[in-house]
């Protein structure tokens, strides 16, 4: 009799232990999925900006700016002596699920940061030497990386573009990364406790992953998920056109027109002497977290 009771107790204890192990494994899998979904490929944000050294948008409003549209771009960048300059460049969106730039958003310089910063930097920098590649194709690749899309799910055309701009080692790294579309029910659970702006970003990234995994999508569909409809109504703490001190010793003011075009104004003070400016080292970051981070390219877009 005691043997039978002990056996029942032992079986019950085994069931409890098995249930706990199963729950622990389930929680671990859930936590891993949450980490994979919520980890940002590019982490650059407004906290990376120097908000102490700024000048009013009205600074240098009475000055004449020398255009760099016909200037030579060298390995060191644009060679600038003391004075006032401006250049128009092609730029890229580095954050999906956000509002497009508007006159209400002020931008400051920040460095490129995050787990995928090297691959993102190479894509944009190497594009300068491949004028045959469309800007939209580079942007689509950037969105794929930012959305943490599985490289194997990308179209053959995009994979070929990546092969032109990246090394075999980089391609191998991309092959190892990425997620598939996460079912809506799972996504709802993952993002339920997160701030609304973060939820919108994660939802946009997930929808973009779904598009990349389909065989039939176009750029405008990707763009629709990357951009929130309307304008950001949140008042920016930094005015449009505000000047910020660049780490290279000059002052810079960003004037985006949409996410794909950027006018940059530069002031090189006498104390800085000769400086070198490489636009693709810059990320223009808005004070509003719901607006788009913009990465500059070295490709001119003079109009």
Describe each region flagged by the PLM.
Residues 7-8:
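Boundary of Sec targeting at the N-terminus
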